[in-house]
Amino acid sequence: DTIFGKIISKEIPSTVVYEDDKVLAFRDITPQGPVHILLIPKVRDGLTGLFKAEERHIDILGRLLYTAKLVAKQEGLDEGFRIVINDGPQGCQSVYHIHVHLIGGRQMNWPPG
């Protein structure tokens, strides 16, 4: 299991900002902006990263993005925010349980790096 599995099972504490039956959202412990929240599916179902997505994952992928919008609104990010999914070694993915980064609260730059 990954660290996210332990966060879902409450073995490891986190600062939860949103939770429903499918998605858990919590503050990143190394924030890259004033607001930095991770959104994860509660059930991994083989979805370790976006490249591993299959047709059966369409609903949860959409749910993650819609939940990111809900959390952004809850966090007051009306002026904008960034959504990031790091995928695979070259994408700097560090935990192999798909997760969405919601980053905001400051002016973002482009290109990101």
Curated annotation (Swiss-Prot):
What InterPro entries does the record tag this protein with? Histidine_triad_CS (IPR019808), Histidine_triad_HIT (IPR001310), HIT-like (IPR011146), HIT-like_sf (IPR036265)
Q: Where does the source fall among the domains of life?
A: Eukaryota
Q: Which SUPFAM superfamilies match?
A: HIT-like (SSF54197)
Any GO molecular function = adenylylsulfatase activity
Family matches, as PROSITE patterns:
HIT_1, HIT_2
Ranges of residues in domain HIT: 3-113
Placement of sequence motif Histidine triad motif: 97-101
Pfam families xrefs:
HIT
Q: Summarize subunit and interaction data from the UniProt record for this chain.
A: Homodimer.
PANTHER family per record: HISTIDINE TRIAD HIT PROTEIN (PTHR23089)
Instruction: Please identify the protein, giving its name as recorded.
Output: 14 kDa zinc-binding protein
Its organism's taxonomic lineage begins at: Eukaryota, Viridiplantae, Streptophyta, Embryophyta, Tracheophyta
